[in-house]
A protein has these predicted regions:
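A charge-rich, low-complexity, intrinsically flexible signal that marks solvent-exposed coils, linkers
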Residues: 1-166
């Protein structure tokens, strides 16, 4: 089980699988493995994807909101967000229902057995800002997580969709 972190960029949802989920603690760096771009319709999808298919399992929208690009070059000139991602480091401000404040996505090569050709490995990092936390759980519990859209848990979605356990 993992969290998908998605940002709308260039008419698609750029997507990363975040195994431990996002953290609002700046000391916690989260592995984020780039996945294929998703269509915009995935912003609202909740349901069960058949096991064995890409992304198979139960899906909820854990958080939703808007983001504001913050990336700039060394002279302080703003860098378009798509370019910042291509360059391997993008900063942004999240105004979500659950996640708030400045975050960064930083691409790196290799590490921890994830040096797979064609696989982009990133870190999702919370900035030290007024929205950061330093105590409490460092990762959302996927079994207790509730949808930002419907308030349902994974188990409720699975039961309602006839998909069994999440």
């Amino acid at each position: 089980m993992h969290f998908d972190f998605r940002l709308e960029v260039g008419g698609v949802l750029k997507s990363w699988a975040v195994p431990r989920g996002p953290s609002e603690n700046p000391r916690e760096r989260r592995l984020a493995v780039a996945t294929q771009d998703h269509p915009l319709e995935y912003r609202t999808f909740e349901g069960v994807i058949t096991k064995g298919r890409y992304g198979g399992g139960t899906v909820i929208v854990w958080d939703q909101g808007i983001y504001h690009p913050l990336s700039h070059d060394r002279w302080g000139t703003p860098v378009p967000f798509e370019q910042a991602l291509q360059d391997g480091h993008a900063t942004f401000w999240l105004d979500g229902i659950k996640l708030h404040g400045e975050f960064a996505l930083t691409r790196f090569k290799g590490g921890s057995g994830h040096d797979v050709p064609g696989e982009e490995v990133w870190l999702l990092i919370k900035a030290r800002d007024g929205q950061a936390t330093h105590d409490g759980p460092d990762a959302p519990d996927p079994y207790l997580a509730r949808s930002a859209r419907t308030g349902r848990t994974l188990a409720q979605v699975a039961a309602e969709e006839g998909g069994g356990a999440p």
